[in-house]
From Swiss-Prot:
Residue span of region CPSase: 1-174
Protein name: Carbamoyl phosphate synthase small chain
Subunit structure: Composed of two chains; the small (or glutamine) chain promotes the hydrolysis of glutamine to ammonia, which is used by the large (or ammonia) chain to synthesize carbamoyl phosphate. Tetramer of heterodimers (alpha,beta)4.
Pfam family, one: CPSase_sm_chain
Reactions the enzyme catalyzes: hydrogencarbonate + L-glutamine + 2 ATP + H2O = carbamoyl phosphate + L-glutamate + 2 ADP + phosphate + 2 H(+)
Length: 392
């Protein structure tokens, strides 16, 4: 018989369910992911550090877990919420059940919760602080402690998942890329190696002299958790890299950090984008890509003198029709740097990609490597390779 568990939110609401995984309690920002598959990649994605993830699909664990579909060296989410778990997987690749995987990494999770109601609450009120507990089953007590817990805003969480030393992969590659590692997904590393790169992962706290010693042909600014505005040292480093005119590419958090480095602003989204079927328009070609997303912050186009393109609260059907008409937008940062918006979300108009007109640098907010998700955007890595070859 499963032990009783309690999920409490900072707005005072609470949900009882059954314990899934380890016993104990965990605190974090409550967010939702709409993927029907890919739960193992979600669990192991370092960008979810500090977050309790609600899976909107009702059955989780059908195909178990395996030794290949991992994005880091272990589970990184703070907690997990599902409607119903499956403890007898049906897949030839499975090496362990989903509940046993949670227990292996001591992850506190809950099942039997109305995840549809929970998702609607997050959509209406926004992502909020929450906690799962098997030891404190008093709703008033747990809600009080949730309210007292730290917010994700202003927190540097990258230090929890960044490496402590340089890690070299594919040393015989045709060209070299430093990955400024704030919690890089292994799928990104796989795609860099796929296009022939020697990969050098470095701590997110290095300085320009550390980068110069490695003499890379390019630098990729990785994904990662937390508030980008809190990573002041990394932002300064990116400014220095731009002065050196080293080819730069950014993914997710890396996109936000590049935007901040040129004088832009970031903002916290109401509930964010987390799923594997988000439509994004490439404004340069008019092509629509189906992409994987995991971000709760975004770059503000208004900080480049451009209009707001939409919001999470607008009617998606009406907004999408209007956004389809937009072509490439060019703005100027407060530092006088020309910024071209290259990609936008067709769901809500969020800025999903940019290019610096006078510097060898570009970035995307979505995840081109997917893992999980469609491969529409994998050309990002070939594009980065071409940029490096042009500059080199």
């Amino acid at each position: 018989m499963s032990k009783k568990a309690l999920l409490a939110l900072e707005d005072g609401s609470f949900f009882f369910g059954q314990s899934l995984g380890a016993e104990g309690e965990t605190f974090g920002e409550l967010v939702f992911n709409t993927g029907m598959t890919g739960y193992q990649e979600v669990l192991t994605d370092p960008s979810y550090t500090g977050q309790i993830v609600v899976m909107t699909y009702p059955e989780i664990g059908i195909y178990g877990v395996n030794d290949e579909d991992v994005e880091s060296d272990g589970i990184k989410v703070a907690g997990f919420v599902v409607y119903r778990s499956v403890d007898t997987p049906s897949n030839w690749r499975a090496t362990m059940s989903f509940p046993d995987y949670l227990k292996k990494y001591n992850i506190v999770a809950i099942e039997g919760v109305d995840t549809r109601a929970l998702t609607r609450k997050i959509r209406v009120k926004g992502a909020m602080k929450g906690a799962i507990s098997t030891v404190d089953l008093d709703p008033d007590s747990l809600v009080k402690r949730v309210k007292e817990s730290p917010s994700i805003v202003g927190r540097d969480l990258a230090g929890l998942v960044s490496p402590k030393e340089v890690i070299v992969e594919n040393p015989e590659g045709d060209f070299s890329v430093v990955v400024l590692d704030s919690g890089v997904k292994w799928g990104i590393l796989r795609d860099l190696k796929r296009v022939g790169a020697k990969v050098m992962r470095v701590p997110y706290s290095v300085d320009i002299d550390d980068i110069k010693k490695l003499n890379p042909d390019g630098v990729l600014i990785s994904n990662g958790p937390g508030d980008p505005a809190a990573l002041l040292k990394t932002i300064r480093l990116i400014k220095d890299l731009l002065k050196e005119e080293i080819p730069l590419a950014g993914i997710c958090l890396g996109h936000q950090l590049l935007g901040l480095a040129v004088g832009g602003r970031t903002y916290k989204m109401k509930f964010g984008h987390r799923g594997i079927n988000h439509p994004v328009k490439d404004l340069r070609t008019g092509r629509v890509l189906i992409t994987t997303h995991n971000h709760g912050f975004a770059v503000d186009p208004k900080s480049f003198g451009l209009p707001e393109l939409g919001s999470e609260d607008q009617d998606a059907n009406v907004l999408t029709k209007n956004l389809q008409k937009i072509s490439v937008l060019e703005g100027i940062s407060p530092q006088g740097i020309k910024v071209e918006i290259t990609h936008i979300s067709l769901n809500d108009g969020t800025m999903e990609g940019m290019r610096l007109v006078d510097y060898p640098a570009f970035s995307v907010q979505y995840h081109p490597e997917a893992s999980p998700g469609p491969h529409d955007a994998k050309y990002f890595f070939e594009e980065f390779k071409r940029l490096i070859k042009e500059v080199r």
